[in-house]
From Swiss-Prot:
The keyword Oxidoreductase does not apply. Gene3D superfamilies: Mitochondrial carrier domain. InterPro entries: Mitochondrial_sb/sol_carrier, Mt_carrier_dom_sf. GO terms for molecular function: ferrous iron transmembrane transporter activity. This is Mitoferrin. Mitochondrial iron transporter that mediates iron uptake. Probably required for heme synthesis of hemoproteins and Fe-S cluster assembly. Solcar repeats lie at residues 15-102, 111-195, 202-302. GO terms for biological process: iron import into the mitochondrion. Keywords: Ion transport, Iron, Iron transport, Membrane, Mitochondrion, Mitochondrion inner membrane, Repeat, Transmembrane, Transmembrane helix, Transport. It is a multi-pass membrane protein. The chain crosses the membrane at residues 17-36, 77-96, 112-132, 170-189, 204-223, 277-296. It comes from Caenorhabditis briggsae. GO terms for cellular component: mitochondrial inner membrane; mitochondrial membrane.
């Protein structure tokens, strides 16, 4: 029985779309929600209107937010990202598995590294189209002095004041960041899987380690574009006044694209501005991607085993 389960787990990429959808949706929710407080810290550090208190580390920043604003504040926007990440990751993992199977002939090995990267790029195009609106709402909820009572109110206000285009203003930047991120991420994961788990059986330890290493490297390399994306998503806060939150809502955006945001970041912070939030981003991504791959592979294994057992 155990051998049959492993065999079906190995053959999953060729035929089991429902399993990939279910496992991917759950993995997405875990990835984005478990380490969400550090994502909130990263957003504030990268915004051009960070909180007044300068903190030496992301952990100190998180403690400062909790002390000044309450322990629930770092979780603002988590429901938006959960709602967006489940369908986005369901499609993301499914497209990746199908593209990988198509490009490699369902075989594994270091010679397929570019195929893994290409599969990740295609999956990212689909993922970001679904995820970008949730990302906009999430980051505006994360900002200090954010006036929105809920993610739904935030989405409604953004739509009424700025139109539907506001939800995709950072889409090209998101792709410019996530295409290399996911290419590095997937190539790194498959590389470490080949090193740690050459038989490609279900092995929780190898999935955890490979996911964490791949996610950490990809996060560090793509931090500059993440800074640009955050500025585009949160630019309303550029004119926020703690004593009058209505100014936040009435502020008009100033950066119409990547080039405007890049120039503004450089003029205000220099080259160091493109590495803001690097530590917080890596702290978020290493456990997040490790857990995401672990949950995905676990549920893929469990669902395939259940299917084999019932038949």
């Amino acid at each position: 029985m155990g051998g049959g389960g492993e065999d079906e787990y190995e053959s999953l990429p060729t035929h089991s779309i429902p399993v990939h959808l279910a496992a991917g949706a759950l993995a997405g929710a875990v990835e984005h929600c478990v380490m969400f407080p550090f994502d909130s810290v990263k957003t504030r550090m990268q915004s051009l209107c960070p909180c007044e208190t300068k903190c030496p580390t992301p952990v100190h920043s998180l403690m400062s937010i909790v002390k000044r604003e309450g322990w629930l504040r770092p979780l603002r926007g988590v429901n938006a990202v959960a709602a967006g990440s489940m369908p986005a990751h369901a499609l993301y993992f499914t497209v990746y598995e199908k593209m990988k199977s198509f490009l490699t002939g369902n075989t594994a090995g270091h010679e397929h590294t570019l195929a893994y990267g290409a599969s990740g790029v295609v999956a990212t195009l689909i993922h970001d189209a679904v995820m970008n609106p949730a990302e906009v709402v999430k980051q505006r909820m994360q900002m200090a002095y954010s006036p929105y009572g809920s993610s739904l109110e935030c989405a409604r206000c953004v739509y009424n004041r700025e139109g539907f285009a506001a939800f995709y203003r950072s889409y090209t930047t998101q792709l410019a960041m996530n295409v290399p991120f996911q290419a590095i991420h997937f190539m790194g994961y498959e590389f470490w899987q080949q090193v740690l788990n050459p038989e490609h059986k279900y092995d929780p330890k190898s999935h955890l380690i490979a996911g964490g290493l791949a996610g950490g490297l990809a996060a560090a390399v793509t931090t500059p574009m993440d800074c640009v994306k955050t500025v585009l998503n949160t630019q309303q806060a550029a004119e926020a006044d703690p004593s009058n939150r209505r100014i936040f809502l009435k502020a008009r955006y100033r950066y119409r694209g990547i080039s405007d945001a890049v120039r503004t970041i450089y003029s205000q912070r220099g080259m160091a501005g493109f590495s803001c939030g690097l530590q917080a981003r890596v702290i978020f991504q290493v456990p997040a991607t490790a857990l995401s791959w672990s949950v995905y592979e676990l549920f893929k294994f469990m669902l395939s085993f259940e299917g084999g057992h019932s038949s």
